[in-house]
Amino acid sequence: MEKRNLTVVREFVLLGLPSSAEQQHLLSVLFLCMYLATTLGNMLIIATIGFDSHLHSPMYFFLSNLAFVDICFTSTTVPQMVVNILTGTKTISFAGCLTQLFFFVSFVNMDSLLLCVMAYDRYVAICHPLHYTARMNLCLCVQLVAGLWLVTYLHALLHTVLIAQLSFCASNIIHHFFCDLNPLLQLSCSDVSFNVMIIFAVGGLLALTPLVCILVSYGLIFSTVLKITSTQGKQRAVSTCSCHLSVVVLFYGTAIAVYFSPSSPHMPESDTLSTIMYSMVAPMLNPFIYTLRNRDMKRGLQKMLLKCTVFQQQ
């Protein structure tokens, strides 16, 4: 039987974005600005919700958790990528790659599940307003979020352990700007059919099930809104849901394009663009979507900034 020499891979080379060195430096500055905007914008959401007692409701509790996840989400990939481009060091250790993969999968799934819970929260608020307080009490919301964190960590751990058991003997060059599932599977010289099955089975369950729940929730919401006779009531219901629906379309549309569509051995530019959209652009736009189109958030933000200004003048 023919024996094949296997080289133990101790590090990977992240090629980054498919562009020239000069363009990559410009993109690194752009992504750093996007990262700072994402971090500051989402921190502002968390601070505003914590400051204004009128925002201490399940809807804004979930929104503050989403803002926290978005900060962690972008922090998993962007700082490492910017440092690699600016220093010219494109390598990442095997352990570092698995760590990045674990947290990335955790946060992307948490984002998905939180969007689902927020859709259900809007469904209860609009379709069953009299039962809203009983169904969405604070204790239940905390337990729900804690359960979601547990599920996402277990799912990420499953993928990380499966990747750690693969052999990498042909190449250690990752055609991507961070350690993601598809590029790592394409590098492996092991049989990855089980990994692919897990991605489509378990990953699909955690990604598509929330999407179905969101679609069902909004279907019931829109049917209820059509029955509202008051024009003002309809406008308020639509404005409440439009922010969340915009985020859902942006996040799910790009994420599904990456993980549930055929990919080539070298990640095409379209996949890279889709990854940037849901991992960088969506978290950056969320604060603007939720603050500029939400009266309560704008009012709370104005109150907080006004109090900070008065405090500084004293």
UniProtKB/Swiss-Prot annotation:
Transmembrane residue ranges: 26-49, 58-79, 101-120, 140-158, 196-219, 237-259, 273-292
Pfam families associated with the record: 7tm_4
InterPro entries registered for this protein in UniProt: GPCR_Rhodpsn (IPR000276), GPCR_Rhodpsn_7TM (IPR017452), Olfact_rcpt (IPR000725)
Top-level taxon: Eukaryota
A GO term for molecular function: olfactory receptor activity
GO biological process, one term: signal transduction
Topological domain ranges for the Extracellular compartment: 1-25, 80-100, 159-195, 260-272
Cytoplasmic side: 50-57, 121-139, 220-236, 293-314
GO cellular component: membrane; plasma membrane
Membrane topology: Multi-pass membrane protein
UniProt keyword annotation of Ribonucleoprotein present: no
Primary location group: membrane
Keyword Disulfide bond: yes
Keyword set, alphabetical order: Cell membrane, Disulfide bond, G-protein coupled receptor, Membrane, Olfaction, Receptor, Sensory transduction, Transducer, Transmembrane, Transmembrane helix
Disulfide bonds: C97-C189
Cellular localisation: Cell membrane
Function summary: Odorant receptor.
Family: Belongs to the G-protein coupled receptor 1 family.
The protein, known as: Olfactory receptor 1C1
